[in-house]
Amino acid sequence: MTQSDHRHTRPSSYGGTVLTQRVSQATVEDSRPLRGWQRRAMVKYLASQPRDFLAVATPGSGKTTFALRVMTELLNSHAVEQVTVVVPTEHLKVQWTRAAATHGLALDPKFSNTNPRTSPEYHGVTMTYAQVAAHPTLHRVRTEGRRTLVIFDEIHHGGNAKAWGDAIREAFSDATRRLALTGTPFRSDDKPIPFVTYALDADGLMHSQADHTYSYAEGLADGVVRPVVFLVYSGQARWRNSAGEEHAARLGEPLSAEQTARAWRTALDPSGEWMPAVISAADQRLRQLRTHVPDAGGMIIASDQTAARAYANLLAQMTSETPTLVLSDDPGSSARITEFAKNTSQWLIAVRMVSEGVDIPRLSVGIYATSASTPLFFAQAIGRFVRSRHPGETASIFVPSVPNLLQLASELETQRNHVLGKPHRESTDNPLGGNPATMTQTEQDDTEKYFTAIGADAELDQIIFDGSSFGTATPAGSEEEAYYLGIPGLLDADQMRALLHRRQNEQLQKRTAAQQASSTPDRTSGAPASVHGQLRELRRELNSLVSIAHHHTGKPHGWIHNELRRRCGGPPIAAATHDQLKARIDAVRQLNAEPS
C-alpha cells in the first residue's frame, strides 16, 4: 500500500479487517450501535461480499440505516467509487439525502436526466424509478463508467410495469454491487421484481428469496416497532341507485361485493355521518395519547384529493386547528411533510404521498379512509405508524368493518413473499371501481356514476389486536366507546392484551347488570338475533375459550387462534362467518379437554 492511497486498515466492527478511507467526520447517528438485525445482516453481507443482496425488514425497523452502513463500508474499502439510490418518490430522494448526511455521506437529490452532471464532492445521487425508466441508457453509461453501488429502496416497485423492470435491468445490470431493500417483498401480480432471486417450492411455485429477513413479529419482540391496535367501525349505510331505489346494508355483515362497495363508499363520504363520527373518535384517541406523548400525530389516508380537502375542512371545524394537507401534484408537498415531521401539530391528511417510505416517527393515530385494499398498499400504509421511539408506545388505526381489511389487520404479523403464478391470486380489482393507490388523485370511478350515498351511522364494532378480536359493538359517542378511546398511550403488548380483556369483561358485566336492573325487557328478547349480534356473541365466546386455553396450555393467544384456523380453516376471527366461529368454538373446547 502506498502513502498516496490515504488508506489504512482497521478492525471491522462486524468482524474481520477492512481497508478504510474516512468518508467524513463521524456524526452522532453514525456512532450509534446497530440494532441486532442490522448487525447480523452486516456480518452476513461482509462475509459473503455478494453482488446482489436483498434485505427484507419490517417498515420502521431501520432499513435506511443498514444501507447507509453498507454504503460507508464499500466506499471506505474502495470496493465501489460511487453510489446510486433509487426510490419510489421525489420526497424520498430528499429524505435519503438527509439521512445520508447524518452518516457523513453526501448524496445529490437534484440529479436529473436533463442535467446528469454532479459535483465530485458527492458520494452519489438519488433518483426515482420513473426517472430511470425514462432514460435507462443514460444511467447504464453512468454505471459502467465507475464502480457503482446501486441501492433499490422498496424494490417491489421495480415490477410496477414491464417497461420499468426492463429499464432497471438495462440501467444497472453492470453495477458492481446491488443492494435491494423492502418492507413488503410481495406484489399483487406476477410481474417479477428485478434482481430478486426466485426459487421453486414444493408446489412448483416460484417464491422470492431474501438474503436477510426481519419480520414485524421479530420487531415487536425486540421493541423496534410498535404494536398496532385496530379500532373497527361498522354502521348502517344507505344509498340510492340509478333507478332511484333506496338500499341499506350494514358494514361488517356478510354482503355481496357490490353491496360492500357501496356501503364502504357511503361510509367514506365526507358529507355523511360516518366519517365525522370516526374523525371525532380518532381525535379523542390522539388527545389521549398526547397526554403521555405530547408530539404524537395523526394521519388520515384519503381516497382522492376531493375527499382529502373535505376531511381537512371537517378536522379544522372539529379541532380549531388547520391540518397539514399533502397532495402529490402540489410542489410544496415535500416541504410540508418535512415540516410536519419536525413540529408538534396534530393532523396530516394525504392521499398516497405518505403511504410508503416516508419517515414521520411521531405518527401514532391513523384513519384508513381509502378504498385501497391490496395487501401491499395496506401494509405500506400501516407501516407509517409502527416506528417505535419510546418503550410502550402503541399505534391506533381506525378502519371500516370490511372483510378484506379485517383479514389484513388480523394478519399484520404474517410474513409474505412474492409468489409467481399463484393460483386464486387475490384480485387487484377494487370493488369500488378503482384502486386509489394507482388511479389519479382526482379521478372518479364508475361506482359514483350509478349510485348516490344517503348516509351511514357509525358504531365501534370491535378492537383487533395481536390477531384477536375484543369488545362488543357500541354506538359512536357512547360511554363504552370512550372507555376504549381512553386506553393509556404507553403500554407494552402484554399490558395492552390484558387491558383489552379486562375492559371487554367489564363492558359485558355492565350490560348484563343494566338489563337485570331495568324493568324494561331486552328489546332483542323473543326475537331472532341479527347476524351482527350473532357474530359478536360468537366472537366473544371464542375469545373467552381461547383465554381459558391460554391459561391451560401456556400458549400465546395468537398461537391458539392460528392453531384453530389450521384445524378448522377460514379467515381470522374478525372476518370469520357464523359456521366458522362455531367450528372453532367446538375445536377449542376439544383443545381445553386435552391433557396439558
Curated annotation (Swiss-Prot):
Pfam families, A to Z: ResIII (PF04851)
The name this protein goes by in its record: Uncharacterized protein ML1624
Lineage of origin: Bacteria, Bacillati, Actinomycetota, Actinomycetes, Mycobacteriales
InterPro entries for this protein: Helicase/UvrB_N, Helicase_ATP-bd, Helicase_Restrict-Modif_Enz, P-loop_NTPase
Region of interest (Disordered), residue spans: 420-444, 506-533
GO terms of molecular function: ATP binding; DNA binding; hydrolase activity
Superkingdom, natural source: Bacteria
GO CC annotation: cytosol
